[in-house]
Amino acid sequence: MGIIAKQSIQGTIVTYLGVAVGFVTTFFVLTRFLSAEEIGLSRVLIDAATLFIGLAQLGTSSSIIRFYPHFRNKEQGTKSQDDHGFFFWTLIVPLVGFALFTAIYCACHEPLSRWFGEKSPLFVEYYYMVLPMAFFMLYQTIFETNANVRMHIVVPRAVRELITRIGLLVVYLLYAFECLTINGFVVALCGVYAVAMLCNMGYLFSLGEIALRPDWEFLRNNRLLIRQYLLYTGFLLISAVASVLAPTLSSFFITAEMGLNYTGIFAIATYIAVMVSIPYRSMT
């Protein structure tokens, strides 16, 4: 059995295990121990962070998949210096995007607070907690994609589908049994994604297939490739507005116009619909 087929099967198993954890969390923990408003708060924070990283990464995840073969030194196989500093730029580009959209997000605090404030003041209170959560989610994704293009799929998927969900389950239970205040609950949610990011980062560095040093000579000799990369990234940023906004738009409108209680109800209903997409997710 080839490595791709083997990892695909293992990845599918991991995905279904993650679904099982998510099912238990959603239908036996959230609905029993948390109020609709608390469920809604966690949902809208995660949705806001998801929207943020979809824009802030500046198309880096797709660019990694598209351009890594052009940077990889095929003569050296999978040695640590084989990507001509490509990994370095996959860290820098989203960092620039994060800084840019952080400034925009902070500038929008007042108008968004007015929009959400009447029906969902609790979200306004934790408005800035979206930023650290988004940062951790952003680099969790970047590290995962870098591992995937190096044909290491199972562990990053286990982090995304299992470790993250188990971490969220633990946080929900700690809050349910009053081991955490609402402030601690929100901080712990961010902490789950911080742990996931560190797991992916540690795994990627343990492979010994990456280097942080940029290869300036390679960039000077391949300026056309760099222009193609920038053009491709620009198109991805435009398309990300629609592709990332569409799945989260309903959550934001419900939160602003109806309140977090309804967002919580919507989150439970959405999870049922998401289960239909399991076969697709197991292949991505």
Per-region residue spans from a language model:
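Signature of the first transmembrane helix
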Residues: 3-62, 102-106, 133, 231-260, ...
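Interhelical loop/hinge segments that connect adjacent transmembrane helices in multipass membrane
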Residues: 1-4, 182-189, 198-247
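Interfacial segments at transmembrane-helix termini and the short loops linking adjacent helices
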Residues: 36-37, 109-130, 260
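Hydrophobic alpha-helical transmembrane segments
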Residues: 128, 159-209, 265-270
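Membrane-interface junctions at transmembrane-helix termini in multi-pass inner-membrane proteins
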Residues: 5, 136-160
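Membrane-water interface segments that mark the loop-to-transmembrane alpha-helix transition
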Residues: 6-19, 45, 57-113, 125-128
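Helix-loop junctions and terminal segments of transmembrane helices
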Residues: 27, 57-74, 149, 269, ...
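Alpha-helical transmembrane segments of multi-pass membrane proteins
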Residues: 51, 103, 118-143, 194
